[in-house]
Structures are given as C-alpha cells and as structure tokens.
Amino acid sequence: MNKIYIILLTVFFYANVYSQQAYFVDGYHGGIYGHYPVKWKTQFVVDQLAMHPDWRICMEIEPETWDTVRVQTPEAYLRFKEMATSNQVEFTNPTYAQPYCYNISGESIIRQFQYGIAKINKHFPGVDFVTYSVEEPCFTSCLPQILKQFGFKYAVLKCPNTCWGGYTAAYGGELVNWVGPDGTAILTVPRYACEKLEPGSTWQTTAWGNSDAYLKDCRNAGIKHPVGMCFQDAGWKNGPWLGSGKNTKNNSIYITWRDYIENVSIGKTDDNWYFSQEDIHVNLMWGSQVLQKIAQEVRVSENRIVMAEKMSVMAYLE
C-alpha cells in the first residue's frame, strides 16, 4: 500500500511540474532595406494569421517598408491593415531604422521613435505602442525615460536568437523594473538569470525555442509563467515558429508581449534593476572592423544633424 501511495505522489508531483503553462512570443523583424521580400511577404503573413487564429505575432518592421508594400501588393496591404489592430498583432519597435541605440545619442534615438511612429500611424492609424521589444540588441541604458515619453508601458530585454550582435546581462526572474540613469523605471521582461547561452553557442540563448531544458530552468528558478521569444527574419517563409495546434512545441501558447505582461505575468515586482551600459554585452557582427567604421560614421553624421539644427535655430532667433 505504501508503494502505491509513493507512486501516486510521484506521478502527481511530475504531472504538476510539467503542467506549468509555457508561453511564446513570435513575430517578424526586418524591412525594405534589409530582408522583407515585398512581392510575397505581406500576403504570406495575412494568410498565416487567418490559417492559425490562435497565433500571435509582434511586428518589428522598418516603418518605411509599408510605403512600398502599399504600392506593390495593395490587396495584401489592405488585408494586413485590417489585422494590424487585432489581438493577433502588436507593433513592438517603431523606430525608423531599428538602430543599435548604444552607439548614437539620445536626441537621435528620440528622432528614430518620432519619425517611425508617425510613419506607422500614417499607414495604421489605430495602432498604439505599449511594449518595446526587438530581435537584435537595440538597447541603451537611457531607454526607460525615452520609452515613457512616447507612451510605452513595458519593455523586453531578451534577444534570444541574435546574440551574435550582443545580448543583455542575465538578471532576475519573471519581471523587473528597468531603472534608467535618470531614475525612470519601466516594467520589463528581462533575460532571466537562468536564461543561459545555448551550449557551444554565442548567438542564441535557451529562450529561442521553449526547449525542455529552458522551461525546466525557469521552473527551478521559480518563474511562474515562463516565456520564450523569436522574431523571425522577415525573409524566412515560415509561419508559427514552434508549430501549430496540437503540434505546438511543449504546448506553448502564442501571445503578444502586451497580453503576456498585462494578463498572464505576475504583473508587478519590487525588483529594481539599475541597468547600465555595462549590462549590454554587444558585438559588431559580420566583420567588426568594417561595422565599427560604419557605426562611427553614423554617430558623426547624426551628431552633425543635431548641431546643424541648433545652429539653424540660433540663426533664426538672431
């Protein structure tokens, strides 16, 4: 009889552990100047959304892309316009050119958001911007203040599938308060302290595919609502990243970041993370010498634009 009780308790324990619900944030990232195959991509996205009503995506597409989409594939554009404000879609990075924010000035970052938001809202007037999330490490320590000024409520510091460009330090649990240098805080999903780099890899963390090992580490770390993510390159002809229906990996539920933070996560935290530039472990991929030079030239150019604007204002006032 004792053996039976032990067996039943063991089964109950493991059933309880593995019944913990996993979540996954899917989406696309790219743009007209990088990888967005205009001739077929938008039609493919709307078809996939219609085919998989339980699928959710976050969009990180360079805003100017929609100018070309509207001209070259107008029917697909109009269909996506109808879906853009549905619960299946969230726009998470409206910056004009998806900059690696750590190498440009705060004024340049503000312009990236200002121009990008205006362009997206020109195409999709009903879209709002609540969560900042990116596929590549487009982070800098001053973002909380800038995000709050543009009406964002939440941020995400994960970039599990593009760590060759860099990644944030692993810290905390389900949620943290990301505190900027000026003291502004924004509720954030971090790269968990238990979210490791994949074995033998410097370009992925374990959160990229909701693997058994990742979910187990989350459970052991006390994370009640584990979530992974991958914003697929827009050039890939692939729908739901983890599969669909009964074939979805580890029974993960697709969700947008806004829905996850507001309706699934613990919702708040007392864990204040004073995030600095040193917590962004970055690298210039695809040839560091060439890209280092490009980054320097970008910074010089953007600084000159700001200087020219200031001189123009001073001349006008005189």
Residue ranges and their predicted role:
Residues 20-318:
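Catalytic-domain carbohydrate-binding cleft regions of carbohydrate-active enzymes
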